[in-house]
UniProtKB/Swiss-Prot annotation:
SMART domains: RAB, RAN, RAS, RHO. Belongs to the small GTPase superfamily. Rab family. The gene is YPTC1. It comes from Chlamydomonas reinhardtii. It comes from the Eukaryota. The lineage of its organism: Eukaryota, Viridiplantae, Chlorophyta, core chlorophytes, Chlorophyceae. This is GTP-binding protein YPTC1.
């Protein structure tokens, strides 16, 4: 194993354009927030290493980087993902309605046992909120995935969202036999080597 970490998990952020995926990523990875974040077209990811139950976990978190506006997210984006966070905007009913479509995309392209998390972002905009917590929670419970409301602006529950996902994946990994072949669910340490050389240029 790589001495720097015990696990390397690939996480994806998906959801409608404008729901705050990039802001969530920036808040968690860099603890920064900007009102005027403009996502680039292409692939964007950031790295953050966390500790969980005495294990060091390297999280490689991918953002769609604007591709969702053109419906061009391809199967390659989902390939190899250990966890997928589906984000909607609590002030935008349509973005919540489209969650089902995003979940269908996951079922179509991602691995069968991928972990999922539903996140309602922009919880700080209480006066503009149209998607009630109880409605989203009931939906998440119905399909059996965790749910959190977050605010990238106020940093509310952002840490908890990513740590919840990391814990869910770690628990799933712990209950599975360790794969001996390449391409198994636990990413081999050597696959993580190119990451550091790219991470500084993907803001």
């Amino acid at each position: 194993m790589n001495p720097e970490y015990d696990y390397l998990f690939k996480l994806l952020l998906i959801g409608d354009s404008g729901v705050g995926k990039s802001c969530l990523l920036l808040r968690f990875a860099d603890d920064t927030y900007t009102e005027s974040y403009i996502s680039t077209i292409g692939v964007d990811f950031k790295i953050r290493t966390v500790e969980l139950d005495g294990k060091v976990i390297k999280l490689q978190i991918w953002d769609t980087a604007g591709q969702e506006r053109f419906r061009t997210i391809t199967s390659s984006y989902y390939r190899g993902a250990h966890g997928i966070i589906v984000v909607y905007d609590v002030t935008d009913q349509e973005s919540f309605n489209n969650v089902k479509q995003w979940l269908n995309e996951i079922d179509r392209y991602a691995s069968e046992n991928v972990n999922k998390l539903l996140v309602g972002n922009k919880s700080d905009l209480t006066s503009k909120k149209v998607v009630e917590y109880s409605v989203a929670k009931a939906f998440a419970d119905e399909i059996g995935i965790p749910f959190l409301e977050t605010s990238a602006k106020n940093a509310t529950n952002v840490e908890q969202a990513f740590m919840t996902m990391a814990a869910e994946i770690k628990n799933r990994m712990a209950s599975q036999p360790i794969p001996t072949k390449a391409g198994g669910p636990v990413v081999r340490p050597q696959e993580g080597k190119p990451i550091n050389s790219k991470s500084s240029s993907c803001c």
